[in-house]
């Protein structure tokens, strides 16, 4: 898949999450900042102003394999750069799975602590990347993420 196709694919999850946040009633407005260089460097796709005045930062990942494998990959390095989970300054990561339309949410800092504390095996992955591969069921069972109804 080309870079442009990857961007288009990732956009699908961003649109779904933005629509979900906007319709939730919890936010006054949601800003798509995925094309802004400043926020790209921080791996933040959406800013949501909560009705209480708090600003929540979201990173959105769209996955095309998890519906077949039942796993989520957390890249810690990709092509010599720091991977998304290690890099993101988002409060939450929304993980959209194409193929079954499921959406999961986890607190980025809490997930980093969980991965470090459990010393999971680090795998070599495609695109010169390495990271953790964990079962969605395990993450749900361990209360590290939750499923969001779309």
Predicted regions and their residues:
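Catalytic cores of nucleic-acid endonucleases
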Residues: 4-7, 28-33, 61-103, 108
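A short acidic/basic microdomain associated with nuclease active sites
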Residues: 4, 18-49
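Residue-level recognition of single "structural anchor" positions
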Residues: 21, 83-85, 112
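Extreme N-terminal tail/first-helix region
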Residues: 1-13, 17
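Non-catalytic C-terminal interaction segments of nucleic acid-processing enzymes
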Residues: 3-5, 19, 49-52, 70, ...
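Short connector loops at helix/strand junctions that flank enzyme active sites
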Residues: 41-43, 53-57, 69, 87-90
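Conserved catalytic cores of phosphodiester-cleaving nucleases, focusing on short active-site segments
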Residues: 21, 46-48, 52-66
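A broad structural signal for short, well-ordered beta-strand segments within beta-sheet-rich domains
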Residues: 23-27, 54, 142
